[in-house]
Amino acid sequence: MPQSAEHVLDHVELFRGPEYQQMLAKKKIFENPRDPAEVERIKEWTKTAEYREKNFAREALAVNPAKACQPLGAVFASVGFERTLPFVHGSQGCVAYYRSHLSRHFKEPSSCVSSSMTEDAAVFGGLNNMTDGLANSYKMYKPKMIAVSTTCMAEVIGDDLNAFIKTSKEKGSVPADFDVPFAHTPAFVGSHVTGYDNALKGILEHFWDGKAGTAPKLERKPNGAINIIGGFDGYTVGNLREIKRILELMGIQHTVLADNSEVFDTPTDGEFRMYDGGTTLKDAANAIHAKATISMQQWCTEKTLSFAAEHGQDVLSFNYPVGLSATDDFIVALSRISGKEIPEQLARERGRLVDAIADSSAHVHGKKFAIYGDPDLCYGLAAFLLELGAEPTHVLSTNGNKAWQEKMQALLASSPFGQGCQVYPGRDLWHMRSLLFTEPVDFLIGNTYGKYLERDTATPLIRIGFPIFDRHHHHRSPIWGYQGGLNVLVKILDKIFDEIDNKTNILGKTDYSFDIIR
């Protein structure tokens, strides 16, 4: 063998050894072999316009959808509250997926439990699982709140969360006055952004509307505070901290709902923090009195904002404010709603972003980009690219709907750089592959899964989105606000300059442009 206890090889090198190469060659012959020439022919055919037409005609199949399921979003929202334990009514395997997905992106532990439903619960219902699960969770993990959501299994058989939680309390699983908000989050409809919305609405409904009949409904007494909702966001650590900094600079009384910026960025100091930070339960209840609720992501919070509006609040939503104009709109709205002046420090930060754009616009201007991801992220990035004079040629969102498509088209139509750009709601990354082959662009913007498109189509990938598994700590830096816009600009420019270097580094042939100044 090529390694020993004294010489352990990384997997990158290990499988290149002669023993593994021989094994893999035999495996290829044994497992459904195909003529290499035929494989090559089909591969080339999948790059054609003819194949693209067939690809876009499919209806009953998704290949590499750029979305996740509802319970992931529910877990993400739930951990944003003080000492809250997400409890997913379903199987252990599903919950392992949510935990690993969040842990691999944020490089932090992700605490979540399940009711461990198996075959018997799928037939007879999961009441016993709920009863035992709530009791064990309450005793073992000492939460202040347990937020319940569901998986496909529980939804298909029709388990009633409200009834199950009441019965569990009657059986003594948790105290009668213990907070157990819930939301039905069927994974076979919607996506993780839907689950975020459902879970957040469920938690606010619990506190504002009488805790499932166990307490009086709260009576709203309006004050001057503003509620902020970040939405499902892979940059929640950096972005929420940036938004809170802006609010504090402006002197605005505020509550960030579902504030998970601390639990996904805990320090290593000898103390394990299963729960850290989060919106306090008292603040979650008092949020009913706020003057307004502002969502940073429209498509993440449609139900929650409607719920806040029903309780008499002014509501306002943005679409992932990246760049100059989007941040202007956000800060002006804060000033208008709160009556506070915009501080000089923010004006200076704006000027620095304008200066950076002016310094680098020649390198970005006219470049073609393809973008995929969640609806609000795609909108925010496309808007910023238009500001930079770039062309968001393909904008694809698997969980985007018709309303999102219309809003995106209006954005593209508002700029000369958006002419000829196309929007693709409900499409997946196999559709994007056809687009990149038949209508090539200069750069691709998306999450880690875009690296396969980068390999197949040779389109350089700029990693922005969720999840980012193969790069570390991107989530710690904001991409909202003026500072966030500068961070995104740097990401784009770094990739542009890397590509220039890659294309000019052959000694004596292309290195006449291998410059140290760009």
Swiss-Prot record:
SUPFAM superfamilies: Helical backbone' metal receptor. The keyword Magnesium does not apply. It catalyses: N2 + 8 reduced [2Fe-2S]-[ferredoxin] + 16 ATP + 16 H2O = H2 + 8 oxidized [2Fe-2S]-[ferredoxin] + 2 NH4(+) + 16 ADP + 16 phosphate + 6 H(+). Binds 1 [8Fe-7S] cluster per heterodimer. GO terms for cellular component: molybdenum-iron nitrogenase complex. It holds the Pfam family DUF3364. Its EC number is 1.18.6.1. This molybdenum-iron protein is part of the nitrogenase complex that catalyzes the key enzymatic reactions in nitrogen fixation. This is Nitrogenase molybdenum-iron protein beta chain. It comes from Bradyrhizobium diazoefficiens (strain JCM 10833 / BCRC 13528 / IAM 13628 / NBRC 14792 / USDA 110). The gene is nifK.
